[in-house]
């Protein structure tokens, strides 16, 4: 109320001309209502004053602080699906799942075609000796066996009676020179020789003086006794040499040799193809082992067992397939083939090997086997 009275007082104090000019100015304006500029009121309160003019625009103020963010609008409608992107990298392998239950067994398939026979494997180690079996029934008498190996030389027996003169033997090898013996007594005079060719007649000589009568000659019996003593001494030396040779042969054969009858099997322990093995034995003065009896085969088997290696034999069927012969070309007089052998597996088995069990098998000559020479 007080503000209203102050406004009326200001209007009354203004000059009349000024008021009229102001009224004219405002009369030209479009007035929506008669009470727009002058508020209508009762007579008691007086007229309100006019609005003042707008002042000049002041300088721009500093930028105010940002207002609080408005409330988020509602989510818009989803846009159209974009194009398919490139394939991503494979992810890491996941952990294996639990093992599934065993499915039912399927029906048995048809039997496959038998594969080709594999190559014979290496020789296995000799098995342990099995338990002794029960004695079987007594068999029939077998054929007479071969002559066994010569036994050890026995001790010298008592001197027997002189036997009849034997046939002249084959000259023996030259023995070791013995010590020089004592000079023997002069032998009996031999028979007179046949007269020589007649020489030219010589000059007649003077008659000589008769010589003294010679001494009586010794009897021939002591000469026979002396010869007998010499023969006995030579026999003792021969026996000594034979014993020494037998002992030397045993030492030489141990442990890589075997003697049976007049044969000696010897190995140096190395393995070679057949051709090289054959050449080595030939250069040493022998040939590859050629067992011609069960005894010789058993002696050779001992060397094979000691070395635990199969060994080549000298026989081949390179000339006629299936017909094995010795190096001399003669047919076999003894054989000890394993069951089902020889079978010429692969069409290239022309040589023979002996296993640790003493059985024979045909084998390719290019394979390497133990070298055993025969002397």
UniProtKB/Swiss-Prot annotation:
Protein localization: Secreted, Extracellular space, Extracellular matrix; Secreted, Extracellular space, Surface film
One of the protein's GO biological processes: innate immune response
Extent of the signal sequence: 1-20
PROSITE patterns: C_TYPE_LECTIN_1 (PS00615), C_TYPE_LECTIN_2 (PS50041)
Intrachain disulfide bonds: 281-373, 351-365
Taxonomic superkingdom: Eukaryota
Pfam families referenced in this protein's UniProt entry, alphabetically: Collagen (PF01391), Lectin_C (PF00059), Surfac_D-trimer (PF09006)
Post-translational modifications: The N-terminus is blocked.
Tissues expressing this chain: Expressed in lung, brain, pancreas and adipose tissue (mainly mature adipocytes).
Modified-residue entries (4-hydroxyproline), positions: 78, 96, 171, 177
Coiled coil segments of this chain: 223-252
Keyword line: Calcium, Coiled coil, Collagen, Disulfide bond, Extracellular matrix, Gaseous exchange, Glycoprotein, Hydroxylation, Immunity, Innate immunity, Lectin, Repeat, S-nitrosylation, Secreted, Signal, Surface film
Residues where 5-hydroxylysine is found: 87, 99
Domain Collagen-like: 46-222
Chain's role: Contributes to the lung's defense against inhaled microorganisms, organic antigens and toxins. Interacts with compounds such as bacterial lipopolysaccharides, oligosaccharides and fatty acids and modulates leukocyte action in immune response. May participate in the extracellular reorganization or turnover of pulmonary surfactant. Binds strongly maltose residues and to a lesser extent other alpha-glucosyl moieties.
Stated family: Belongs to the SFTPD family.
Other facts: Pulmonary surfactant consists of 90% lipid and 10% protein. There are 4 surfactant-associated proteins: 2 collagenous, carbohydrate-binding glycoproteins (SP-A and SP-D) and 2 small hydrophobic proteins (SP-B and SP-C).
Name listed for the protein in its UniProt record: Pulmonary surfactant-associated protein D
Lineage, uppermost ranks: Eukaryota, Metazoa, Chordata, Craniata, Vertebrata
Gene name linked to the record: SFTPD
């Amino acid at each position: 109320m007080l503000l209203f009275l102050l406004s009326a007082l200001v209007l009354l104090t203004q000059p009349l001309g000024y008021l009229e000019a102001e009224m004219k100015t405002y009369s030209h304006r479009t007035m929506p209502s008669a009470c727009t500029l002058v508020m209508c009121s009762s007579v008691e309160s007086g007229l309100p004053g006019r609005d003042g003019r707008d002042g000049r625009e002041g300088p721009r103020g500093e930028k105010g602080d940002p207002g609080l963010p408005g409330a988020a609008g509602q989510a818009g409608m989803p846009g159209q699906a974009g194009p398919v992107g490139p394939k991503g990298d494979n992810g890491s392998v996941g952990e294996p799942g639990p093992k599934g239950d065993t499915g039912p067994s399927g029906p048995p398939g048809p039997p496959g075609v038998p594969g080709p026979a594999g190559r014979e494997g290496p020789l296995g180690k000799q098995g342990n000796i099995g338990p002794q079996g029960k004695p079987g029934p007594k068999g029939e008498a077998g054929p007479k066996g071969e002559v066994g190996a010569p036994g050890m030389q026995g001790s010298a027996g008592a001197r027997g009676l002189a036997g009849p003169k034997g046939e002249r033997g084959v000259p023996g090898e030259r023995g070791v020179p013995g010590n020089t013996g004592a000079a023997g007594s002069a032998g009996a005079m031999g028979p007179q020789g046949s007269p020589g060719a007649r020489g030219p007649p010589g000059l007649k000589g003077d008659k000589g003086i008769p010589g003294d009568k010679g001494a009586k000659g010794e009897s021939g019996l002591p000469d026979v006794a002396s010869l007998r003593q010499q023969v006995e001494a030579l026999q003792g030396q021969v026996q000594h040499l034979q014993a020494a040779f037998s002992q030397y042969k045993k030492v030489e054969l141990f442990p890589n040799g075997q003697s049976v009858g007049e044969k000696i099997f010897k190995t140096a322990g190395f393995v070679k193809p057949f051709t090289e093995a054959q050449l080595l034995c030939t250069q040493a003065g022998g040939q590859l082992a050629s067992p011609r009896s069960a005894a010789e085969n058993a002696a050779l088997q001992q060397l094979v067992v000691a070395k635990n290696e199969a060994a080549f034999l000298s026989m081949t069927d390179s000339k006629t397939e299936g017909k094995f012969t010795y190096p001399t070309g003669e047919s076999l007089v003894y054989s000890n083939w394993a069951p089902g052998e020889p079978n010429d597996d692969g069409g290239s088995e022309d040589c023979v090997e002996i296993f640790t069990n003493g059985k024979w098998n045909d084998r390719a000559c290019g394979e390497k086997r133990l070298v055993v020479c025969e002397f």
